[in-house]
Amino acid sequence: MVRRPTVLIFGAGVSEDYGFPLARELLISITDSFENGTKVGFTMTQCGFDREFIRRFGDELYFSNQPSVDAFLEQHSNEADFVRLGKAAIAASLLQEELTPSLLNRTEMRLYEHLWYHVTGPIGTYAGNQLAVITFNYDRSFEHFLRKSFVASHPKFRNQADEFERALSQIEIIHVYGSLGSLDKKSGNYLVYGGRDDPFNPKVILSASERIKLYHEAIGRDNTTARMRERITEAETICFLGFAFYPSNVRLLQFCGLGENKETKHFGSAYGMKLGEHDFIRQELGFDIRLAGEQTKSLDALREFPVLQPVREDIKP
């Protein structure tokens, strides 16, 4: 169990290990599909968007040289049709990726499995978990993984839905920019993982797209930032995983209290980043942070730093 207040902050690099595209990859995938009229591009016409408008959107997205579709949409936030199409394309792309079998690839230990090892226990002990995950990703791969793991590990949960949801809720997952939908069947925002059985149904895609938020929509519109602030300011340890440290995302975290608690220890992966970029990250954050090397991915960074250390009573002789 994770019994000390601990926050993991997920970026796109976490989901990449489970088959989801990085920000730039998603942008290129959407522009290619819009140009060639393949699956996602064709689906946008079924969602009611004009072919010529789709083509123009794709051209502007490609030549914008923005780091992500989200960043592009933020620049076009006053153009409602651009925002609607962009969000729909993101939703259609990620619902398709949710259906890929990469989540079930068990040939090697990966991040989700490692986290499950640290949070699992007897049914009555889950209330002791103090782990929270703040994710900048729209996909629900981590929630889906946890649900599968909970039920497979505890058959009792199959017939006790309320107890299952209570246990699951002890590991709080906060989607900064929204998600494709809730995996809780009792939720009004419920959407089955991958949108099965019809992930390219226009109603499914448009419904999922309405739950996606841009930067300017994430500030103070609901209780998300309040929940983030509570977890961030109370955390003894915060670890960034697969996170690119884009200035806008850092500012949002600072708005939610990042750096206010001077006792919090900060760690992070920095896969593919050079030492000079480490200095830039520290300047952006405004405090010191221990960063793993440029060849170290999320799982190994988490294992390298003292983030999930058990308290003494959890250590077996």
Question: Model segments located where?
Answer:
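Short, conserved catalytic or adaptor-binding loops enriched in Gly and charged residues
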Residues: 162-168, 203-207, 258-260, 282-286
